[in-house]
Design a protein with these regions (language model features):
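AAA+ P-loop NTPase catalytic core and its hallmark functional loops
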Residues: 2-195
Length: 197
């Protein structure tokens, strides 16, 4: 995971006028970053922003609020968040919580590596600990499809000032001031909208 050892911006250093950047009626000005990094999504210049959803997501970025976007499958919920992050030059990581994602995928694992010609075991942090420690918008896609063991891990970071204990390293991680969490869901916790028997 050497790719995770990159320089990310430290503090927002640019003001963005919501009316001009997102083409919606608002006097709001939000903070973002001047420069784009490799973790910032590409801008889709043809994307049209829904006003209510955009303002809710911007509140998440500006005021460190946890925001969940609900809607039907394929309506662009995750893309909406990514396109806002793209325009704010905010590093963004999207994790799909399908049935294949595990605690180890999120938290990290021991890996064997060569050091001075010898094999050693070293813990490699997963995307969750890395994201928590950086100015990153973490998007949990299909939040309602997450496995229970994975959801217990995520529960620990839902509080805006919540510390995160990484048991594998006997380490307590403090959330970066600019770490943000978003989620998308199809069912708002109500289960499948249609069940075939």
């Amino acid at each position: 995971m050497s790719k995770l050892n990159i320089d990310l911006p430290k503090k927002p250093n640019k003001d963005f006028k919501v009316s001009s950047v997102f083409n919606i009626k608002s006097d709001l000005v939000v903070k973002g970053f001047e420069n784009k990094t490799e973790w910032v999504p590409e801008i889709d210049s043809s994307y049209v922003f829904d006003e209510d959803t955009t303002l809710a997501v911007l509140a998440g970025f500006q005021h460190n609020r946890r925001v969940m976007v609900q809607g039907f499958h394929g309506t662009g919920k995750s893309t909406h968040i990514e396109q806002i992050a793209a325009r704010l030059n905010w590093p963004c990581v999207r994790i799909n919580l399908d049935s294949h994602i595990s605690r180890i995928d999120l938290l990290g694992k021991d890996a064997i590596k060569l050091e001075d010609g010898k094999q050693i075991t070293e813990f490699q942090e997963g995307m969750l600990p890395w994201s928590i420690q950086n100015p990153v918008a973490l998007v949990f896609d299909e939040y309602d499809a997450g496995r229970p063991d994975v959801m217990f891990v995520i529960q620990r970071v839902l509080e805006s000032d919540g510390n995160f204990t990484l048991l594998d390293k006997n380490k307590v991680l403090q959330q970066h001031d600019l770490f943000r969490i978003f989620a998308t869901t199809n069912t708002v916790g109500l289960g499948l909208s249609l069940i075939h028997i």
